[in-house]
Amino acid sequence: MKKLLLGSFLVFSSLMSAQLFLQLENTRIGVIGGPNYSRVRNAHNPSYPRYSFYGGLLALIPLDYENQFYIQPQVEYLSSGEKGEGSTLYANNYISVPIYFKGYFTEGRDSFFAFAGPRFAFLINQKVQNPASPLYVKDKIGKARGFDFALSGGLGYSINRKFEILARYDFGLSSVYPDLVESWSGDPNVYRKKSQHILSAGVSYIFGE
């Protein structure tokens, strides 16, 4: 029994070591960025989408020897939020850390791919310009939460496993403005979650082979 357990442990350790070596040896680094369209539901009234951008770095960590499945963590600057009428702006800027499971549809150099995973975002600054109400400013009930969580996923196409184009959607699960629940506004959505939703396009370039 002891020999069986020892043998099983050695086999498991060997497999884990091989997997770790594969991941470290073949991890590739890249850059990513593009435009985005963001809205915050049930928050400011009136509310319109904001068009902005994101950009950062990624790591492509292999999970198999066929170069088809990966973990892809990213670190990005993400500019999002919403707009109001005229020059009214409610901008939230984050350091965003999505962690994707990524799968290519084929083993070929050119291939469609899909990705999905959690996205963690940490607020670095907030800009409120010409708010529709004096209470919407960040020093009062309009202050944005310092952490935003979302589920993120999308589709893309890879050219030679280097240059990639993609589209993704972030479905917010956090309430961006937790204090924005004042009934004086007359808005029936005022007590609902102020979740952020972001639709993005992007391009990435992955270095190495």
PLM segments and residue spans:
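Glycine- and aromatic-enriched membrane insertion/assembly motifs of diderm outer-membrane
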Residues: L24-G30, N36-R39, P46-A91
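Outer-membrane beta-barrel translocator domains and adjoining extracellular loop/strand segments
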Residues: R41-P46, K83-T88, Q126-P134, Y177-W184
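Membrane-embedded beta-strand positions of outer-membrane beta-barrel proteins
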Residues: I29-G33, I71-V75, I99, A114-A116, ...
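Transmembrane beta-strands of outer-membrane beta-barrel pores
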Residues: P35-R39, I61, Y77-G81, N93, ...
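Outer-membrane beta-barrel "beta-signal"
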Residues: K193-E209
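Repeated loop/turn-to-beta-strand initiation elements of outer-membrane beta-barrel proteins
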Residues: E66-F69, R109, R161-I165
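Residues that define the transmembrane beta-barrel architecture of outer-membrane proteins
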Residues: E25-T27, S47-F53, A91-V97, R145-L151, ...
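Transmembrane beta-barrel domains of outer membrane proteins
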Residues: F21, L58-P62, Y100-Y104, G154-S158, ...
